Amino acid sequence: MGRFADRVRGSDPAEIATHGLGGFEGGKLAALLSLVALSLSGYSLWETSLKQADMQVFVPPVIQYAAPYQNSNFEVIAVPVTLTNEGARTATVLSMELAVTDPRTKQTKRFYAADFGRWTMERTRTGAYEPFAPASLAGRSSITRSVLFYTRGTDQKPDQLIRDPGNYSFSLILELAEGADKPAVSFDRALLQYDARAFNEGTLPLYSADWRSASNTKRE
């Protein structure tokens, strides 16, 4: 008891206060670190599991076109499309629609995604295409396919929209199963020259004026 009393009597009040303050500050630091760890864990959970699907659409500088049949309004536009899901949740593409406008006449013709593959008359005769079907894209993943868009019905006019050399305006719209949001990308492509003989076997190219891809992403 004597030794304990001596230790108590010999304790410096300032030293006791310092030790108490140090413990309090240590507790605050531990609480702060725990809060930071919890925030990081929540952010990681959001990014990896909870973030809504975010579909980005990319179209390259060159696409292909053909009007292979006479006395018909059938036209085909081959567009290589890259889809990237920047979200965490799965996105399902139900359909793709392509609207093409001739800025000179203001006429617009609509097309639907029908097949995958490279268009040639030989492949058409043999049916060597993969039919378009709804596709799911997991979070943080991407896919690239060459999509063949065909004229959407006999009511679409004019019979041949793309004929005169010059620019044409395109709008590609995706329908997703997850909601009303429809990712879309608009772009212009130019037909440099027209030669119908190319359609006997293949297609004619249309080019981007600046040789850059188009996308629905916001550039800084």
Say what each PLM segment does:
Residues T92-L137:
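The feature marks short-to-medium sequence segments in extracytoplasmic or secretory-pathway proteins
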Residues F74, L137-S142:
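Solvent-exposed, conformationally flexible loop/turn segments
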Residues I143-D181:
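Internal, hydrophobic beta-strand segments that form the core of beta-sheet-rich folds
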Residues A14-L50:
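Membrane-embedded hydrophobic alpha-helical segments
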Residues V81-T90:
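Asparagine-centered strand-capping/turn motif at beta-strand->loop junctions
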Residues E47-F74:
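Low-complexity, acidic Ser/Thr/Pro/Gly-rich terminal tails and inter-domain linkers that flank the onset
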Residues A180-E220:
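Acidic, serine/threonine- and proline-rich intrinsically disordered appendage/tail regions
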Residues M1-L21:
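N-terminal Lys/Arg-rich, disordered targeting/topogenic segments
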